[in-house]
Curated annotation (Swiss-Prot):
Annotated family: Belongs to the WTF family.
Gene Ontology CC terms, in alphabetical order: ascus epiplasm; cytoplasm; endoplasmic reticulum membrane; vacuolar membrane
Pfam families (UniProt xref): WTF
Species for this entry: Schizosaccharomyces kambucha (Fission yeast)
Location of region: Disordered: 1-39
Self-association state and partner proteins as the record states: Homomer. Forms protein aggregates. The two isoforms can interact with each other and with themselves. High sequence similarity is required for their interaction.
Top-level division of the source organism's lineage: Eukaryota
Protein known as: Meiotic driver wtf9
Skewed-composition ranges (Basic and acidic residues): 11-29
Segments passing through the bilayer: 89-109, 119-139, 149-169, 198-218, 232-252, 256-276, 286-306
Function according to Swiss-Prot or TrEMBL: Promotes unequal transmission of alleles from the parental zygote to progeny spores by acting as poison/antidote system where the poison and antidote proteins are produced from the same locus; the poison component is trans-acting and targets all spores within an ascus whereas the antidote component is spore-specific, leading to poisoning of all progeny that do not inherit the allele.
GO biological process: one example: meiotic drive
UniProt KW keywords: Cytoplasm, Endoplasmic reticulum, Membrane, Toxin, Transmembrane, Transmembrane helix, Vacuole
Amino acid sequence: MKNKYYPLRSSMDEMSAKNDNEIDLEKGPLPEYNSEDGSTLPPYSEIWKYIKTVSEDSSTGPTETTNPNVERRQEFKDSHPNIYSLLRLLISVLAVIVVFFTAWVCVNPLEKSIFGKVAFFVTIGITCPILLITIFCFFETWTQAVAQCIKVTVIFLAQCVKVTVISLAKCVKVTAISLAKCVKVTAVGLYNSREKWVVIIWLLWVVICYTLFLRSKFGNLNLNKALICSTCSISAALLLFLLYVRLPFWTLKHMFSGLFQVLGVQSCVVIVTKGLMHLFDKHIDATGYEIEASSLFVIGNFLFFYEMECPGALRRMPKSIRNGIASFLEGTGKAIRGANDNNNNIPLEETEAESEV
C-alpha cells in the first residue's frame, strides 16, 4: 500500500481557492494570500473586520483624563454663556484695578516731576487697556495658572507648618529629656558626694534667714508678708532639693507631696499665730510677723534635720498621722464604751437599796 502525501492547507486556503474565479465588483479582485507567511489576513474576512473595528475604537477613544473642574466650567459656559462672559469681564476688570492701584502707589511719589506724570499717563492709557484685553482673552489660562499657584502655595505652607510643629515638638521633647537627665546626674552626684553639699546649702540658707531677721530688726527693712512668703518658699525649695539629693529614688509625686506637706505645716503655723494675735486683740505688726517668720524658720530646720536623720520620714508622715488619729479615736471609743459597760454592770440589789433609802 502506497503512502499518499496530502499537503496541509488551512480553511483560509480552501475559501480562497473556491473564490479564485469570483470577483466582487464593489470590493475589487482579492489579493493573493499566502498561508505559509500568515502575516497578512484576507481583507474581507471576519477576523480582519474585527481587528479593524478594535483599532478604530482605540484610536478614537479618549487618551487623557479630563479635570472635573474644567468639565464643570465648560458645562456652565455652555448653559449660561452670557453670565460666564460677564463674570470674565468682571474678574478681568478687578485684576486691572489691582494693577492700576499698584502702579499708582509706585508712581505717586514721582508725580511732581514730568517723568512721573508721563509714566503715570502711559500706565493708564496703554498698559491697562492692553492688560484688560489680554486678561479677558486668556481668562481660562491665567485663572487655571493662578488656581494652581494658590494650590501649590497652600500645600507648601501646610507642609512647612507641619514640619515646623514636628520640629518644635521634637526640640521640646529633647530639651525636657536633657533637663531631666541633668537633674538626675546632679542629684546622683550630690548623693555620692555624701552630705557635705547638703549641709553647705543648709548653712547658706540659715545665713540668709538670719540676715533678713537682723535687717528687719535693726535696719530699714520692714518685716512683712513678703518676707514670710519668701521664708516659706526658701524652706519648701530646700526640702524639695533635699528630696532630690537624699532620696533620688523618689518619684516626682513623692517630691511634690513632701513640698505640700511642708507648706501645709507652715500655713497652719501662720493661721494659728494670726488667730492668737486677734484673740488677744493685738494687731499683727512687726512683732507678729517676726514671730511667724521665726516659727517658720524653726519648723523648716526641724523638718530638715528630721529628714536627714530619718530618710523617708516625711514620706511616712501621712500614714503615721492617719494611724495616730485612728488610735486616738479608737481609744476614745473604748473609753466611752467602758464607762457605759461599768454603769450597766451595777448589781440590781444595790440599785434597790439606793431606791429604798
